[in-house]
Amino acid sequence: MMHKPYLKSFPNKEGYFGKYGGAYLPPLLIEHFKEIGEAYLKISQSFDFIQELKSIRKHYQGRPTPLYYARRLSQKAGGAAIYLKREDLNHTGAHKLNHCMAEALLAKHLGKKKLIAETGAGQHGVALATAAAYFGMECEIHMGEVDIAKEHPNVIRMKMLGAKVVPVSFGERTLKEAVDSAFEAYLKDPANAIYAIGSVVGPHPFPKMVRDFQSVVGAEAKEQFLEMTGELPDHIVACVGGGSNAMGIFSAFIDDPVELWGVEPLGKGKSLGEHAASLSYGKEGVMHGFNSIMLQNEDGSPASVHSVASGLDYPSVGPEHAYLHEIGRTHSVGVSDEEAIKNFFALSRLEGIIPAIESAHAIAYGMKLAKERLGEKILINLSGRGDKDIDYVSETFGFGGEE
């Protein structure tokens, strides 16, 4: 009997991947998210939407992004051959524009005038502000004060693109609070605005929608890898915060005999509050409108988290990642702040590519894996470039010494 392809089977109609996902919302928002879900199913299949998105990706974003054999990185590891999917070369410097242009296009079809969202590292904020400028919409981005200080170049970019940046000054003042703040702003104006969630998290239909919009990464990479090597990679490695870049590249390979590695931020240590490795240390819980694995305090509230990468600093993970982890289809592994920074410099010095600190987590684990897997092929999703991080890294860690 032929099995239905994974992507056509999950999530179910209610937005569940196994027991994870769903839409846990206040009554006022249920109808609005239902409207987005129904519109998405209808509009995303329409010829006009598909053609316009294809054209945007090719002529505006510069897709497909290249697949690159990292020769010197591979030599340094001394085992497997390492290939990079260059999402750092997507317009705005990360994978985020893949779903932002599509979310804005959907908003246009729905007659919405305003895009509201949260951002951690600022990449989603920049990408959404870019999409808003392209389509002539208003844009409001909520960002924790800690991240505003750390990712200042992206704050300037957002403002230059015409977005309003709302500083979030409560709680930890990072990504979780930015989501809370953005949700509140959206609650005030759901008729005119769309909450353009920045990852494969949040209430249904967002985990499915963002995955589908990001699946272009995996589809391209698969075709490029077959063309370049004649076979599929043995391993795919991607960093996981909420998990949009990882789901984007994993999506094309779930039904194939390829090992999938999701790299979480181990931060400074294993104690609660020192890391943001939800799959490794979390338990089931509901936050931000979806059921998943999350890091929680004893009372069940979301725990404090830490990562050197603002974009990974989130106490939960996309429900699809929780499901794939639970059924053993993906491996959840971790990389510390220190290892990430070391590999931030390694990629810069060995290949002339400065990665985002988030992506440096994937490089770090890919290097570790490569040392153990002689003769195998590893594909790492290089989810973004490090322009946003150079001030922070140079001020905090210097210039990395000699490689």
Swiss-Prot record:
Would the keyword Amino-acid biosynthesis turn up in this protein's UniProt record? Answer: yes
Write the Enzyme Commission number(s) for this entry.
4.2.1.20
Q: What does this protein do?
A: The beta subunit is responsible for the synthesis of L-tryptophan from indole and L-serine.
Kindly state which keywords UniProt assigns to this record, in alphabetical order.
Answer: Amino-acid biosynthesis, Aromatic amino acid biosynthesis, Lyase, Pyridoxal phosphate, Tryptophan biosynthesis
UniProt protein name: Tryptophan synthase beta chain 1
Q: How does it assemble?
A: Tetramer of two alpha and two beta chains.
Q: Which organism is it from?
A: Wolinella succinogenes (strain ATCC 29543 / DSM 1740 / CCUG 13145 / JCM 31913 / LMG 7466 / NCTC 11488 / FDC 602W)
Cofactor dependence is on: pyridoxal 5'-phosphate
Q: Which HAMAP family match?
A: Trp_synth_beta
Classification via SUPFAM superfamilies:
Tryptophan synthase beta subunit-like PLP-dependent enzymes
Which top EC class is given? lyase
Q: What's the catalysed reaction?
A: (1S,2R)-1-C-(indol-3-yl)glycerol 3-phosphate + L-serine = D-glyceraldehyde 3-phosphate + L-tryptophan + H2O
Record CDD domains: Trp-synth_B
Is rRNA-binding found in the keyword set?
no
Q: Which GO terms describe its molecular function?
A: tryptophan synthase activity
Q: Which gene encodes it?
A: trpB1
